[in-house]
Amino acid sequence: MLSVQTTRAAKLQLGQLPSIAYTARSGRLHHQFYSTVAEKTANPTPNTSDKTNIFDIRTKVYDETDIRKHDDNQFITHPLFPHPTFSQEDCLKVGYEHRPPRTFGDKMAFRGIELVRGSFDFVTGYKKPKTQADIDSGFKGTRYEMTEGKWLTRCIFLESIAGVPGAVASFIRHLHSLRLLKRDKAWIETLLDEAFNERMHLLTFIKIGKPSWFTRTIIYVGQGVFCNLFFLFYLANPKYCHRFVGYLEEEAVSTYTHFVHELQSGKLPKFENIKIPTIAWQYWPELTENSSMLDLILRIRADEAKHREVNHTLANLDQRKDRNPFGLAIPDLKEPQPESGLKVTKPHGWEKEELKL
C-alpha cells in the first residue's frame, strides 16, 4: 500500500499548492509544493546588496525583511529523516562536556582536533573564551570580536565540514555490507541521519546570510582535503575516526554555547528580531514562523550534543560485531539506554558495559 507523507497544515505557506508526485524509487507518495504566479509576483528582489570584497571572509547578513525572499519555493520535499522533538528546557540544559582521552588513539584524535580547530580559529578570526572576563568583554576592539557576519561564516564553514564524516562512514559501511553479504546492524541509518542533519544546519545558515567567495573557496578546498583523508582513515581505523568526530562535536557544542551567550547578552543586534528561514521551522518540529534566532541556535547546539554522544558511543563498540544502540529502542529494560531525544543522554558516550547489544 502506498503511504502519503503530509506536513503539518500550520506549516504550509500561503500561495503554495500541494501536488502529489509518485516516487518510483521509494514506492511512496510525497507532497511537493509549487509556487504560484501570485507568489512569485509577491516575492520581489531582495534588498540586501550582493556586492562583497572577494577577500572578505565575513558573511553578508541578509536584511531582516529579506530573509523570506531567499526561501526555496519550488519542489520542496519532506525531510528524509524527521527530526525528534526537543523541548526548550532540554535544549537549555545542553552544555560543553569533554571526554578525557584514555588511550593512545584517543589522544591522537584529540590532538588532531586541536590542530584543526586552531587553524579554523585563525582563519575565521575566532578565539575561544577561557575566562568570565573574556565572555563578558567579547574581545571587543580586537580581531577576535565576533560580529553577526563572522558568526555566520564560522557556522557555515563548521557545518560544511561536519556533514562529511557521517556521509563517508555510511558509504564505506554500505559497501562493506554489500561486499560481505551481511547486515550492518543499523549503523548506516544513524550515520546518514547525522550527515543529513548537519546539511540541514548548513542550508539554514545560508538562508540567513551570503558567504563571500573567499569563504566558498576555503570550503571547496577544506572539503576536498578532509573528505579524502577521512575516507582513508576510516578504512584503516573506524574506531578512532568516531572518537575524532566525538571531539569535533565537542568543539561544535562549545562554539554554539558561546554563540548562545552572545545572543542572550544582546551583543548581536542584527539577530534580535530576525525571522528564521522557512526551512528551519519546517525541519525542527517545535519551531514556528515566529521563533527567534536563539531558539534556532539552541536546537542546533542540541543536535551537535547528540552527535557528540553518538560518536563517542560508537567509538566504544566493536566496529564489526556490535549493533548500533541508537538504531533500536529495546522495550522492558530496567537500565536506561540510548535514545534519539534529550531526555536520556551521556555526553561522554555510553560505555559498552552499559548497553544491551
From Swiss-Prot:
The UniProt record lists the keyword Thylakoid: no
InterPro entries in alphabetical order: AOX, AOX_sf
Positions with biased composition (Basic and acidic residues): 348-357
Main localisation: mitochondrion
Keywords from the named record: Electron transport, Iron, Membrane, Metal-binding, Mitochondrion, Mitochondrion inner membrane, Oxidoreductase, Respiratory chain, Transit peptide, Transmembrane, Transmembrane helix, Transport
UniProt keyword annotation of ATP-binding present: no
Binding site for Fe cation 2: 198, 249, 304, 307
EC class: oxidoreductase
Gene3D superfamilies, A to Z: Alternative oxidase
Record-stated family: Belongs to the alternative oxidase family.
Annotated protein name in UniProt: Alternative oxidase, mitochondrial
Organism: Scheffersomyces stipitis (strain ATCC 58785 / CBS 6054 / NBRC 10063 / NRRL Y-11545)
